């Protein structure tokens, strides 16, 4: 292991975060490529997360969120890695909103809301053993983003 990851377990963990983030980013890109309706994209994303959670019997949530909640709180390299992932997702969503005519400052705030919302909804879904928190939250986020783009 140390041959490929001279920094040991920490370097391996940071690389795993980067790899996982890239997979999620590719998925997000595919979802955005299928629709120009930010609301539909949002519902699709939340529904995908709900299905994935249900398929694992509520055992798996967002792996980036899991690392951000626990190990990253005591490890600066992991905190920075998870922060970079969330920032890249926020930038991606903000770019879509800006492209739809939403003012930059508002788009950034909405992107933070859109990225933070599934994390909380996943926690509730796991606690309730139900996909309803994800599906309900997805609809609210979708409606909020749609309203912003309609005014944009």
Predicted ranges, named:
Residues 40-42, 56-80:
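Amphipathic alpha-helical segments used for helix-helix packing
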Residues 30-32, 50-54, 64-73, 96:
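Helix-loop "lid/cap" segments that line or gate small-molecule binding pockets
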Residues 35, 74-76, 86-111, 147-152:
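Hydrophobic alpha-helical bundle segments that form small-molecule/ligand-binding pockets
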């Amino acid at each position: 292991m140390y041959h490929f990851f001279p920094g040991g377990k920490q370097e391996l963990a940071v690389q795993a975060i980067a790899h996982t983030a890239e997979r999620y980013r590719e998925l997000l890109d595919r979802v955005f490529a299928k629709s120009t309706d930010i609301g539909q994209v949002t519902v699709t994303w939340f529904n995908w997360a709900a299905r994935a959670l249900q398929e694992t019997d509520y055992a798996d949530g967002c792996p980036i969120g899991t690392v951000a909640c626990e190990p990253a709180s005591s490890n600066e390299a992991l905190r920075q890695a998870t922060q970079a992932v969330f920032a890249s997702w926020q930038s991606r969503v903000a770019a879509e909103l800006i492209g739809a005519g939403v003012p930059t400052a508002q788009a950034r705030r909405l992107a933070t809301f859109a990225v933070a919302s599934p994390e909380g909804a996943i926690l509730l879904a796991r606690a309730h053993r139900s996909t309803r928190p994800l599906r309900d939250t997805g609809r609210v986020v979708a409606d909020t983003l749609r309203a912003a783009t309609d005014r944009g």
